[in-house]
Design a protein with these regions (language model features):
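Peri-catalytic and regulatory segments of divalent metal-dependent proteins
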Residues: 1-41, 48, 52-60, 79-80
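Flexible coil/linker segments and helix-coil junctions enriched in charged and small residues
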Residues: 22-28, 84-86, 113-117
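An active-site-proximal "capping" alpha-helix that borders the catalytic cofactor pocket
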Residues: 61-80
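Charge-dense, low-complexity polyampholytic segments
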Residues: 81-111
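Pan-zinc metallopeptidase signature
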Residues: 115-191
């Protein structure tokens, strides 16, 4: 078994960011590169989550895509920044992933129809949650992992207060759930 990350996908991530921000006066190529890396890193961990579920035959409830999203968010939240001595790098990575989902939703729901004259119909039946739902979920997990650091997400209304109330518990349950599921697997993740 193997994980495959397609060059076309990676290219789409970078092109998508450039589509939204490439003409900005303060466009920063390093921010662009970091964004692309962070989204690709997230997708890698998302696929690792699928692999763990498959290889170790982990019992899950709910959509596997959501569970894999949760695993990826958890792994990013554990990213330690040795320069600052904190986990703020992981928070930035999660913000970039949230931005990616937000922009994907914006493109398909508003920009694509305006540019093509074709109506976009969300795939409500798909195994993936809608991009806008994934945006709010990722934002919630970021907030829940460190509410004090991420209070600005609520203050700027990127995360509604009604959702933020339960985010710390949601994050705890994700962390606890994955620790439990992988507890019998000698992988070193939760040692």
């Amino acid at each position: 078994k193997q994980l495959v990350m397609c060059y076309e996908f990676i290219d789409d991530v970078f092109e998508g960011y450039y589509y939204f921000y490439g003409e900005d006066e303060d466009f920063d190529e390093q921010v662009w590169a970091d964004y692309g890396y962070n989204v690709v890193d997230y997708v890698f961990w998302h696929e690792v989550g699928h692999a763990f579920i498959d290889i170790y035959e982990l019992p899950i409830t709910g959509l596997e895509e959501d569970v894999a999203d949760q695993f990826a968010a958890l792994m990013l939240s554990y990213t330690y920044d040795s320069e600052t001595g904190s986990y703020t790098l992981g928070q930035t990575m999660l913000y970039d992933v949230g931005t990616w989902y937000y922009n994907e939703n914006l493109y398909w729901s508003e920009i694509y129809p305006a540019e093509t004259g074709e109506e976009y119909v969300p795939l409500y039946w798909d195994v993936h949650s809608l991009d806008i739902q994934r945006f709010y979920n990722i934002t919630c997990y970021a907030y829940g992992s460190d509410p004090e650091y991420n209070q600005h997400l609520v203050n700027t209304e990127d995360l509604p207060e009604d959702r933020a109330i339960d985010c710390e518990y949601e994050y705890f349950m994700i962390e606890y759930g994955w620790e439990y599921l992988l507890g019998g697997v000698d992988n070193g993740f939760f040692d």
